[in-house]
Amino acid sequence: WERVGFVHGVMNTDNMSILGETIDYGPFGFIDSYDPKFICNSSDSHGRYAFENQPSIGLWNLNALANALVSLISVEELTAILKTYETTFRKKYYELMGAKLGITDVSEADSQFIDRLLLILEAEQIDYTNFFRSICEYRSREENAFLANLFKNRAGFDSWCSDYDDRLRQLNLPREARRSNMLAVNPKYV
């Protein structure tokens, strides 16, 4: 859900299935301009369920499930399982975010590269969905006026694009294949 900017307004333990799927029909939303602190529930004044907090709420919910299973599974085994959450979530999150940029083999350096882009999007208040859909048409730093025009701080985005060009060259993936892959994971509308 984070890949597309979806925000659960209430992500309590009773609103999450044993498979980790959320099943609440209460408040929800999609981030417009990228804001990790976005809250879609007017009663969540402290931001417990803010966009950036949703992964840790998932872990909180899994801890609650583990407490319910302690009579069936040892505390040590449950603890070992829960310790894998952050690494597993982080790996999958960056794979999904990398796919939005056409990056097929995400490395630790890519996660920093993605974080850098998100900081730029946040500072510039760029529409999350539209940006990622638009970047599907990206060719190179020199041919990105359609994207660069969205940014007030063009120098910051231009610097990111220069690094993006380097990363795309490393992939050695034809532009049309990359574009097709990106269109499949970057919705036009949410």
Where are these regions (language model features)?
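Catalytic activation segment of kinase domains across protein kinase-like and atypical kinase folds
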Residues: R3-H8, N12-N61, N67-S71
